[in-house]
Amino acid sequence: MPNLQQTASQSQHHLHPHHLRPQQQQQQQQHHHQQQRQQQQHTHHQQQHHSDFPLPDGWDIAKDFDGKTYYIDHINKKTTWLDPRDCYTKPQTFEDCVGDELPMGWEESYDPNIGPYYINHLAQSTQLEDPRQEWKSVQEQMLSDYLSAAQDQLENKREMFDVKQQRLLWAQEEYNHLKLAASRSSLCSSSSSMSRHDPELLRADLMLARERVHQLKQELTHITNDISYTERGMNTLYSVGEKINARENGCYDIAEVQAIHEEMLKVHKSLVSGEKVREELMRSLVQIKNELGRQQISEENSDLASPFDRVCVASQTDLCGSSGDNLNEGARFAEMAKTTLQYAEWRKHIKKLQQQLADHVERIEPGQLESDKDRILLIQEKEKLLNDLNSISLKSRSEEEKRVIHQTRHKLEEDLKEAYEANNTCVANRLRFHEEKQLLLDKLQEALKSTKLLEERLKTFSSESTFSISSGSSLGSLVHGQHKSALSFTDIYIDPFAVDSPIDVVDLRRRSQRLFQQHQQQRLHPVHPVLQQQQSAEVTLSPRSSLSMETPPASPMKYNAGADQTPQALKEEPTYANALHAPPAYTAPPPVPISGVRARPYDLDSTVLDCMMLEAKLQKLNMGTPLNLAVAPLSPISEKPSLLDLPQEMLSRSSSTSNTRSVSAAVSNESVAGDSGVFEASRAHLPRKELAQVQIGLKYLKQEGVLVVSLERANNLLALWTASADNSQVYLRAALLPNSLTSIRTKALGDFQKPVFNDTFAVPITLDKLLTKSLQVTVVTMTGQKEEIIGTVQISMAEFNPEDSTLKWYNVLSSKFIPSFESLDIPSTSAAAAAAAVAASNAPNPGNNREESSDESTITSSQTSTLTRNQAPCMELQEQIAAELMGLGPLNEPECSDDDDDDEEEELEDKQLVSDVGLMNSSSMLHAYLQNMKQEFADKETNTDRAYLPEKSRGQSQLMDDRPVKRSQTFTPSAAVSKNRYNCRLNRSDSDSAMHCGVAPHTFQRGAAERRSLRYLSKAPKSVTKLHHTHIPRTSLDLELDLQAQHSKLYFLNDQIAKLQNLKEVLQKACDNKDPLVAAWAIENEEFQRLVARADPAKCPEERQLQKLLMKTAKEIHKLRKTKVPKGCPDLVSFKEKITFFTRKGLSVPELPSEFTLPEANPIEEEEEEEDEDEFYNSPETAIAINTALVASSNRNKNLSEHLHRATSGAVPKIPAPVVTPAVTPAAAPAATPAATPAATPAATSAATPAATPVVSPAAQPDAKAADAPIPVASNDAEQQRFDYVVDRNYGVEV
């Protein structure tokens, strides 16, 4: 048995070989011939093995219980792992090593959890770093450089705090002067001649000044939080560097690495449980916010129809599978081939965008954007302070105050000039790169939306086939059982939920430059925007005046549009209040619902087959040529009568906010003239009984990207229907042409005279695509199982104004005016056919019940396929296309899985969301379709009806064997099909019905015992352990940064939970008391709206799925960038992202202001209440104090940085981590939010109290579900005491 001293130990005597590498570099040119001679000797040594040399005398070989060889020295009575013959075959030092060699005494080993590590048998130690590389010294230098840059960034934040504090001083002084004037005005109110100012104007100015002071205080609080966050991150980085440098060799041994790894897993479990608590709290806040919004609705609107009263009238039965025999198969498969081609192009576009983003990441320095943002914000703050000083009246000021104000102005102007010169030379290129990156991100998001839409459509096509996509057929679904034992880079440092949306620095810089140019040109007068006046609703003498009014009965569509919005979002006028809630230009637009299926209460059902069938029929019509009609139809332009001619009931329901443009309703010469602007429309007639008309409402929601179509009612449809209407029903069907993805239909009614449908649907479509389409509404009658189109309405969306909503009557063009219009027999859209479809789906199908597990089933299915080879060509081609759809991976399947296994659990979670539909070869699809339409089928004397192309020849057009070959109907693609498509052939000599054509043919053995119907040469399972987990080296500094990042995330997660619980209690109390002030804050506060928008349950599943796709795309971009790193070389960008993670601002939870929770006092009475508080600001030496603070700002920052440098370079006192017992609830602990006061310094205001917030221990249970209950804390964690917390002496910030 070997001695334990040879195994991995925790001795502090480590060999540090790094000092040998510089010597090798210095002597490389001097001893070049010596290195060549050593290489020749090394080549000679490599040819010699241990077996070529005998063991020395007194040595013996033995094996341990695990099979590892060790050696016994009988002379010294010792055991060792080292072969005594290594002195003949291995180099002695690192200088003698060539290539990837290790010297004598060193060994490379592998651990399944931590990866490769190295053993020094001579020093009896282990370490994580590769002794042949100098990556550790490069990391230390990068960390030191970043800390210097972060110190500059912190000084910019402190200077910004000083400038904003000076602005607060001036604002407070102005507020005090206004209060004094208001009090004097109130005392002299009895005599108007003694009052110099209007009391009402003074009160209004006082309120504005008060709001300004309140806003500046809030901004000071935000800056204080930023300073505290940055200081905490910097102190964490300082402590990590000190901890690594404190070790003798600067490396962790294998035992410490394993302990850190276990601790990271514990913290990760606590993070998972804490995120569940946070999500539950945010969902509760969404509910409370909605309740507060409902309380804000006035009583006069209480009688309006609620947007939630609408019930989805979409079809609840899947009618696709039972109508395959009666549908136009040609149009359907042609559309499928076109969709597949588009899907392939979008996939290529996504890969290209990912590659471009991976290239852009290398061009942008991590953390540089935040520094540029702080510089630009500092410039803006100085500009605002300069404007405040310029607006001060100097009449009542003393000479000393005037001199100080002039000096301050001059100093600010010089600072701004220098800052602009520096920014123009340094920041321009970085901002250009950032702007390009943002553009690529927007394109990537749009590409993902379009690709997901095509995926849903392909999934709809595949659902019509006899094959069903099972959840177990996805690749990798059987290998997810093992628990992931390692945390990757993306698991730790990519957390989109915890990071606020980035600020558009480009727009910020442009605005700052405009302000500077205005100041340089002395254009300080305010620019008032031109107010757009609303159009008058009066009737003019022009015939076109009727186009500016509508005949709109009150439609539920106008209220359903805001079913998932706040009451403020229902306001469509571009007011200032709406501008506050509108997302800024730099933020990504909200995810657009990909499909209309179950997206909202009024959503439609994706009856794609009905719409495609309708398009196929309409393509046969000659709509472009003029029709010689015996009776000319009326003008299709939707004219509106004068208000004098309208009935009283319609006059009372008219609206003044209508569309000013007309919409074509049918095809005629008058409609073309009307659209061109030449035709002067005559006075519109009132709806007459002999005309068939349909009332349609249209509204476009820009934020959601949804067109709301309201099919309200119809009038006199009997004019279109000549048969008896006793046993018939009528319904409306609508679709956006051309290339419609969805069709919508209303419920069927038996009333042909005045049917009232009142059905509202939402069609997700972008605005640019909407303006190129036409809305076609078809009137369909249903008699039993026979359906017939009796009329149609065509509305050009090019004339639709998306800024306004319309509700109009449209004339219906009868189908008898079109000679080639055929009746449509669509049993799938009737209720009787729905029942028949359900009965047919429940009937047993002998062909589909068979399985491929036996040879008998294969023989039987081959006989069936041979007899029915030339029958039902469309269904066979449908099965073929469905099989191809199943044979490809999903959209978000990672391309490179050789280095990271971190996506396995996420793929398992997304298996229910992401459809298992992929890319198909468009050329083979079209060729198969043409061959099917020609009724040409190959007879290869086999029982295979589908020839799967191999992976390498997907894009090549095959001239031979391209015709679809029928195969067994019982064959179902297995999980392996999702990666490699293959040709299914019958090898009669071996009785294999589906053999891979890509593998080498095996030798035939007659009478073999194994089953030959099984797949030959199945793919071997992936090995559990890989020898090289990643080719990028990892050091102890990386490991310590990962651990501290996890602890930082846990700390801020607990802080967020405490703030969310406090906010929930306050809002819930205000909701119960119906407090209007708190309700107004919850609805109008932008920060709170952004917070609750992350967890709004009203989001459709497609939006959540798109967010997951974006997250996976970010991980794929990281993998693409990592593949560019040469093997063995460090990843510099990833390490920079690690260290910038600590100073990156996380998710901010807004705090409810105390002014909104208490009743607001009278401004004059409040003067007495705040008299003591404002004594500091009533000093006549305010201007001198401001100038003194401005001059001393830079000196104080220098002193602070020197103190911080001395504190971090010297001995730092360490204290044990605070332990919070589970009895302390988050609600009882005060929130650790530093409150900034105007008189406070940044050093004092940045002091945080982390001990006051509840702490989630790494041993917390992951199944914590209660939102109000604190996460349990472990009491016995001896390993956690190893990670100390450092307290900065100057600022008191605990790390």
Curated annotation (Swiss-Prot):
Keywords: Cell membrane, Coiled coil, Cytoplasm, Membrane, Phosphoprotein, Repeat, Transcription, Transcription regulation. The keyword Cell membrane applies. Belongs to the WWC family. KIBRA subfamily. Residues 1-59, 540-559, 840-871, 889-911, 941-971, 1153-1176, 1247-1278 are annotated as: Disordered. InterPro entries: C2_dom, C2_domain_sf, C2_WWC, WW_dom, WW_dom_sf, WWC/KIBRA_Hippo_Reg. PANTHER family: BOMB/KIRA PROTEINS (PTHR14791), PROTEIN KIBRA (PTHR14791:SF29). Residues 540-549 have a biased composition (Polar residues). This is Protein kibra. It holds the Pfam family WW. Residues 690-810 form the C2 domain. Residues 895-909, 1163-1176 have a biased composition (Acidic residues). It comes from the Eukaryota. Regulator of the Hippo/SWH (Sav/Wts/Hpo) signaling pathway, a signaling pathway that plays a pivotal role in organ size control and tumor suppression by restricting proliferation and promoting apoptosis. The core of this pathway is composed of a kinase cascade wherein Hippo (Hpo), in complex with its regulatory protein Salvador (Sav), phosphorylates and activates Warts (Wts) in complex with its regulatory protein Mats, which in turn phosphorylates and inactivates the Yorkie (Yki) oncoprotein. Kibra acts synergistically along with Ex and Mer to regulate the Hippo signaling pathway. It is found in: Cytoplasm; Apical cell membrane. One of its GO terms (cellular component) is apicomedial cortex. Signal peptide: none annotated. The gene is Kibra. Residues 856-868, 1247-1274 have a biased composition (Low complexity). One of its GO terms (biological process) is negative regulation of glial cell proliferation. One of its GO terms (molecular function) is molecular adaptor activity. Residues 200-228, 334-460, 1048-1075 form a coiled coil. Residues 941-965 have a biased composition (Basic and acidic residues).
